[in-house]
Design a protein with these regions (language model features):
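C-terminal coupling/interaction segments
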Residues: 2-5, 253-310
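Extreme N-terminus of proteins, especially the signal/transit-peptide cleavage junction
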Residues: 2-14
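Short loop/turn segments at beta->alpha junctions
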Residues: 104, 225, 282-285
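Short, surface-exposed beta-strand/loop "edge" segments at domain boundaries and coil↔beta transitions
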Residues: 163-168, 242-246, 269-274, 288
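ABC transporter nucleotide-binding domain
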Residues: 180-267
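A general boundary/transition motif marking the beginning of the first structured unit of a protein
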Residues: 9, 100, 115, 172, ...
């Protein structure tokens, strides 16, 4: 990292620190009091249902919209007061292209290069070859997936210390998604770079994320190590007559079917559900947790303290 870009006499330990972040909209939606940290050298997945506040959070980090409360530090710098220095060290991929559609790939480099003191033309060229992007191709003629790859090439070609990606795998085929996950894993391997990316494809998280931040209804449900999140819940399946009183008290979410139910229970509460004969208990996937904590039949009976998955 360029020492000149850091506060004098300090070296940050966190790539990103968000404290008490709040944003109110006239529509009534509020992103409420979100707090989390991302250390250097790790990948954080940002998850939640549509409309949960993931894109709002990313826009706030990038100062694309104003916050009502809270503080954001990027690489030890105040994201608002030190915006220019911060953005020199960010790599950004949004869910839609930020380039003018009649611009060529070559012109995209010419407009991007002056914004980044550490721009590496040879590295950008290498990514263009890797992604199969011709310099004379117009942005409007690129598929959504290829436009994402162009933004990624720009993001990776100026020694950005933090990548912020909004649904980067949307529009990519399976092979391209695997390639992207490999690139991100390599990117953080030196311990000096970090990634935060939002996604609705939980398989991507299970493959490469170290940390998970889960937002639902504008509130932080959990932020911490992905492994702890995965270990914190169990999926309990049973027939229509097997929904015991103990299970109803313990569950934090449920979806019922004609043939039975899927219930989400914190691992620590499994011994208290009673009547387990006939019930199938298994590890809950990230997708299971998101699905059942946002199901139409989400119960308020169980312990649903946000941010506490122990």
């Amino acid at each position: 990292m360029n020492d000149s870009s850091l506060p004098q006499g300090t070296r940050p330990t966190l790539a990103l620190s968000v404290t008490g972040l709040t944003k109110h909209y006239d529509s009534g939606f509020t992103l409420n009091d979100v707090t989390f940290d991302l250390p250097f050298g790790y990948i954080m997945g940002l998850v939640g249902p549509n409309g949960a506040g993931k894109s709002t959070l990313i826009k706030l980090i990038l100062n694309m919209t104003t916050r009502d409360a809270g503080r954001i530090e990027v690489l030890g710098l105040d994201a608002m007061a030190d915006e220019e220095r911060v953005k020199e060290q960010l790599g950004v991929v949004l869910d839609s292209s930020y380039f003018i559609e009649y611009m060529t790939v070559d012109a995209a480099e010419r407009t991007s290069r002056p914004m980044y003191p550490l721009w590496d033309h040879n590295l950008f060229d290498a990514y263009l070859r890797r992604f199969g992007l011709g310099r004379n191709k117009k942005i409007k003629d690129l598929s959504r997936g290829m436009q994402m790859k162009l933004m990624l090439a720009v993001a990776l070609s100026h020694d950005a210390k933090l990548l912020i990606l909004d649904e980067p795998t949307s529009g990519l085929d399976v092979l391209s998604r695997d390639e992207l996950m490999d690139i991100l894993s390599d990117y953080v391997a030196d311990g000096e770079h970090s990634v935060i990316f939002s996604t609705h494809i939980t398989a991507d998280l299970e493959r490469c994320a170290d940390f998970l931040t889960y937002i639902t209804h504008g509130m932080l449900y959990y932020s911490g190590p992905k492994d702890e999140f995965e270990d914190a819940f169990r999926l309990v399946k049973g027939g229509p007559d097997e929904l015991t009183d103990g299970l109803q008290r313990a569950m934090v979410g449920i979806r019922t079917y004609a043939t039975g139910f899927d219930a989400l229970v914190r691992t620590q509460d499994i011994p208290h559900i009673g009547g387990t004969n006939g019930l199938l208990t298994q590890h809950a996937s990230i997708e299971d947790v998101i699905r059942l904590t946002n199901a139409a039949e989400h119960t308020a009976i169980g312990n649903t303290n946000k941010g506490d998955v122990r």
